[in-house]
Each structure stands twice: as structure tokens, then as C-alpha cells.
């Protein structure tokens, strides 16, 4: 009798995706982040579901309902902080996952990569709307500033902003619709992640060498299931440490003040994972230019396959490209730091230089360096 997992219509899909999947024998721990992102999404959906049971999306009671969750609901504080810090873990895994893709040339799987970029945008949109829900000062002013950026779009800008707000300012209508979207988007993300996986399994995984691994495949289970479990345990340990020892480490103290449209906080800034894009936005003095740069800073990832000029897929054997890659990482960390600083000298000029370097590295310097490496290898 044939094994049920190989014949049953549903079990067969699971079997071919997580059990008998032929996997390269040499993929490193940088390939763990896909499964970690899946775990993060599950944690976020579950904690979010329990939070939604107690949260009210009304401007008068939203802040109080979050306080009520933390004070009166059984382990409500734990659920709330797991959800808030779970988002940070989600983005850490996302950035490492994208960085891995850029380093090892995984972007040459075009469909998988493009859906991945779409997923990145969806997660960023979800996180932004989630940050608005507690209705603290930074929630309100963050929502006001970021949605206001759309007014830079010529002709339809101001109408579009009022349409998103549902009125003439960020108010009850905005909060209600943000809650609705914040609830539905994670399920869309889960569906997209399924499609992401579907396209990945059409080609099979890439590996650190960037060379075809068809001649040397091993089954996913037990080799990579056990490896993923180690990654998951480390993720849970980090998240638990963050939640139980310093849950507000990555948050903003201003968000413990209820939203007040009449009082602007001295420094409006988003959560840490958006700071790099926020720094790029602020480094351009023109509103429309800043908005374009903000969108392009992430949309530029779509161009990665077109900007690949190297004859080798991976950066594993390309020392100059490796060097530039780590300069890009350092540049992004610099932008993240600048995004959290006030708009004054010397932070303005540092942000502008870092922004120019970011786009120059991706669009010009790295492709030219790859061509140079081809020449050096007489290819």
C-alpha cells in the first residue's frame, strides 16, 4: 500500500512542499529565514486575533481599549507585546531574507523575487496601519504625516488624501478603515506567501555557490526540518527575551500619550524598521521628489535581476562585489540611524550623502564592478 501522504490530494501538497522536497545539500543558515517568516506570520495572526477580540476601533475608546488589554485581560500584556515585538522580529527576518537574496543572486528566480517584493510592500503597509491602531500621539501624527505624502501626487493628490482619511483629517473613519485593512492584509500576505512558495518549488532553491545543485539533492525532512526547528527556537528565545525583559525597547514613549490633534510631538518618526526609508524621504527638499525616492528605495529591488551583469550568480566568489554589498548594509544602517535623528546639521548632510550612496551603489557601482570582475576572470 502506498503511503497516504503521497496519495491523498491535500497531504500530497504538504508532502511535496515540506517533506519529500528535493533540497540542495549545501544551503546555509541564511536559508532559514523563509520558515522563520512563516512562524512570525502565524504568531502575528494568532496574537492579532486575540487582540482584536478586545480592541475597539473608535477614536474615543481605542487608547483605553489597549490599556484595558494590558491591565485587565488575562495575559493581555503578553499578547500585546508579543504582537508589537513580533512585528520587529518579522522585519529583522525580512531584511535578512532579502539581503540573502541579493547576496546569493536568488533574484534571478524572477517570479519568486517579484512576489517577494510585493510581500514586502504588503507587510510594510500592514505594519504602518497597525502602528496607528493604539491611537497614541505617534500613531496619530505618524498617520497624518505619511498619508499626507500622497498629496504630493499631481492633480489627484489632495482628493486622494481626503478619500483615504474619510474626512478632512485623520479621525474616526480613518481609524476604523485602518483596523479593517490591518485585519484582512495578513491573510492576503499568507496567500501571497503560498504563491511565493509555489513559484520557488517550480525551480527549486538556490544555494550559496550559485551553481545548479540538481546533482546533489537531499530530502527536506529530516535534514532541514531539524535545522529550521533550531532557527525557530532561537527566534522564540529572542522574541521572549525582548517581550519579557524590555518590551518597550523598540517602541516610542510618545505613544503612551493619547492622540491629541492640537499638540504635535517634537520629533515625529516611524517605527525603527521604516527609518531608513524615512531618512531617504527627508533627505530630498522637494515633497514629490521625496515621495518618489521613498517608493523607489524599495521598488528598486524589482530591478535587481536587470542590474545583474555578473557571469556568476552568487557573490560567494566575487570579493569586490562582496565588499560593496557590505558597504550597502553599512549605508542602510547609517540611514536607519539618521531617520531617528532631528532634522539639523550634521544629520541632514549625512542623510543626503547616505541616500545618494544607496541609489548609486545599486544602480551604478555594483553593476559596473560585476563587469570588471568578469574581465578580471577573462569571461
UniProtKB/Swiss-Prot annotation:
One of its GO terms (biological process) is mitochondrial electron transport, ubiquinol to cytochrome c. InterPro entries: Cyt_b/b6_C (IPR005798), Cyt_b/b6_C_sf (IPR036150), Cyt_b/b6_N (IPR005797), Cytb/b6-like_sf (IPR027387), Cytochrome_b (IPR030689), Cytochrome_b_C_euk/bac (IPR048260), Cytochrome_b_N_euk/bac (IPR048259), Di-haem_cyt_TM (IPR016174). GO terms for molecular function: metal ion binding; ubiquinol-cytochrome-c reductase activity. Its main location: mitochondrion. Heme b b562 binds at residues 83, 182. Its cofactor is heme b. A ubiquinone binds at residue 201. SUPFAM superfamilies: a domain/subunit of cytochrome bc1 complex (Ubiquinol-cytochrome c reductase), Transmembrane di-heme cytochromes. Binds 2 heme b groups non-covalently. Keywords: Electron transport, Heme, Iron, Membrane, Metal-binding, Mitochondrion, Mitochondrion inner membrane, Respiratory chain, Transmembrane, Transmembrane helix, Transport, Ubiquinone. The chain crosses the membrane at residues 33-53, 77-98, 113-133, 178-198, 226-246, 288-308, 320-340, 347-367. It is found in: Mitochondrion inner membrane. Component of the ubiquinol-cytochrome c reductase complex (complex III or cytochrome b-c1 complex) that is part of the mitochondrial respiratory chain. The b-c1 complex mediates electron transfer from ubiquinol to cytochrome c. Contributes to the generation of a proton gradient across the mitochondrial membrane that is then used for ATP synthesis. The cytochrome bc1 complex contains 11 subunits: 3 respiratory subunits (MT-CYB, CYC1 and UQCRFS1), 2 core proteins (UQCRC1 and UQCRC2) and 6 low-molecular weight proteins (UQCRH/QCR6, UQCRB/QCR7, UQCRQ/QCR8, UQCR10/QCR9, UQCR11/QCR10 and a cleavage product of UQCRFS1). This cytochrome bc1 complex then forms a dimer. Belongs to the cytochrome b family. This is Cytochrome b.
